[in-house]
């Protein structure tokens, strides 16, 4: 293999007798007779002490005879420019020759070692003979079993299969030869290739100084096709899927809550951080609500909760039958808003953002919905041309009504305060372990949709199931009297049926109440004189015969909200007024005990009853 002379000044250059003539242009016209003299002298004993401190690493006797006849030729031009080549600098080389045959700067063939050309064509494949021609052409002149220069510390190109030379691992670890770093001042430096640029483009800048430690064989790259273009290929771009994945990971880390006890990921991290405040600034305007004390972190959540306190009927002015018994009515604002979104195509406006530009729903007119659509707000009697404008108006309108203090609410507060201060009530509460403690209430209102009339089984807290109890912790251990005085212990909150008004015509078929027969309304009339009940009766009327009457004074709560009453209610009140407005002669004397006859003069004479406690058969009387 490669051996060095006694001094660097006595080294023989690659081109001793060959001059730069046009014959180099034609690879097949190249004179191969003098190639034996191109190599360096093979005297290993004449190497200077600065290069070898021990016996030579490679011996010529370890190679096959046919390989020893040829000098070591540089392999395919390396991927690095000349300034970063792993070949040691030799003073005998001229600046025109370069470290390889094809790198002559004055030749007609363009050299791939030129500093201005940083990419190599595909024709520069691994040929093992350094000329840059395919192995099929140069196979008759150069054997393919050639091993690279011993000074290539990186082992860039390796043969596939068993090698015919001794591996590095067979030598001792203290082979201890050191190469002197080449003087970079003699070599041309590329302007655009710095160490930083090479590190960014993925090209490793390797020092020509091999490691003095144990040599390990590098991994062979012959498992795939190797080429200069693949070695010097630029850094591949990330695929769109990988870019999206990296972006998602980056956005997920940005949205992660920094609170040590939380650590969850939120889209709106700024809004979530408000929930970690010690005090929630937004309070519910209803004094009796426990969120008047707890509060909310965001105004949007407070307004959404306040809408649940609305007590009234909201009529959709964009559905058919508005103003008639067939109108679509709601008793909850959130359910009404879902109806506008799902049925009338209203676009929801996200919180803390601007209103959207007018769309198709904002251009529609009232007549486009249905023939009898009014577009009227049942709360404030305002008229709107489309459902989108009414949807944006609904929150402010309902919140204004809810936040108004009703006169009856003031009276209720006074009465409740008197009960809270009563000592007897406190003793009773303590006796039954009903402490005045606020229970946990979910921030989200329960899902309720009048479009689907179903019986929802929900696990509610004891405060929701039993409104008279103010704590749910004590119910878990309280014994409950069941049927036939059987004592059972309630360990968990019992499942209660949340029944809405529109569910009253959806009873199970086994009850014998088909929905077709559920068309009547029942009015129960109870007339009292102080604590004495004077009258109680029931009246049934089919919905088809019910007539709605508009109250002239409205709802009477200080707003312009319209209110309605049926003709049956009017007739029922007339009967009550007839009883209460009767004089003493018309009422007659008050009889203690159960009554044996109807009030007033009967239309039919009653049979004589021997005993006052006997029951009266109503069917016999009415027959």
Swiss-Prot record:
Zinc-finger as UniProt keyword: yes
Zinc finger (C2H2-type) boundaries: 255-276
Domain of life of the organism encoding this protein: Eukaryota
Localization per Swiss-Prot or TrEMBL: Nucleus
Gene Ontology molecular functions: zinc ion binding
Disordered: region residues: 202-256, 468-493
GO cellular component, one term: nucleus
SMART domains, A to Z: ZnF_C2H2 (SM00355)
Keywords in alphabetical order: Metal-binding, Nucleus, Transcription, Transcription regulation, Zinc, Zinc-finger
Compositionally biased tracts (Polar residues): 202-219
Phenotype of null mutants: Leads to decreased hyphal growth, azole susceptibility, and attenuated animal virulence. Results in the marked up-regulation of a series of drug efflux pump-encoding genes, especially atrF, which contributes to azole drug resistance.
Chief location category: nucleus
Single Gene Ontology BP annotation: regulation of transcription by RNA polymerase II
UniProt entry tagged with the keyword Nucleus: yes
Biased composition range(s): Low complexity: 227-239
Gene3D superfamilies xrefs: Classic Zinc Finger (3.30.160.60)
Function, in words: Transcription factor involved in fungal growth and virulence potential. Negatively regulates antifungal drug susceptibility via transcriptional inhibition of the expressions of drug efflux pumps in a crzA-dependent way. Under the treatment of azoles, both zfpA and crzA transfer to nuclei and coregulate the expression of multidrug transporters and then keep normal drug susceptibility in fungal cells.
Record-given protein name: C2H2-type transcription factor zfpA
Protein's organism: Aspergillus fumigatus (strain CBS 144.89 / FGSC A1163 / CEA10)
